[in-house]
Amino acid sequence: MMHLILADSELELMPEEIKKGRILLDSSLHHSLMKGLKDWKRRGRPDIVHIFLLIAQESILNKEGLLRTYVHTRNNEIIYVNPEMRIIKNYNRFKGLMQQLLIHGKVPLKGGSLMKMKKERLDELLNKIKAKKIVFSRKGKRKALQDVFEENVACIIGGFPSGNFISSVEKYADEIIRLHEEMLPAWIVAMEAIVAYENFMKLHL
């Protein structure tokens, strides 16, 4: 089983210090309002979460029942994604869904949840996952993923456009891996990790 975690993702409601109202923060729409926020240049990026989830949830690995996906936010919330969740491809509709999730803690509001959110730190989640933990970072070593994977593995990927993890992820890592000399988008790292694990598990034979 692969546990795929998007850590320190920049998914949040608009902070009250810039505007009251429960609206999803999006840097493409709220750029001028965000300049007074700490770390404003990296915040308000639901697009990263959207593309990451599209790739993860539509993967062969997920269809084979071997993937569990989580999104950890800068405000220490964990979003648990049901493997049966099919991500809305329209970005504006996806943002509406994320806004509803951040306000109410689950979607859909009635019936079984396809996504649920709880207040939880990244280390609390990692302590519950009994698997080898691999952090993807430019600070890591270049290694072939086939050489570091085990049958149960947790892959931690940064959910931010630039910079470093806010959380102390390195202290929980069994391996810190660098895929490339340049910083790669989160969804590319996720895609590389998923396909490498599919090959490790011989799903393409």
Predicted regions and their residues:
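Conserved beta-strand elements of beta-rich interaction domains across eukaryotes
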Residues: S9-L11, G140-K141, S162, M183
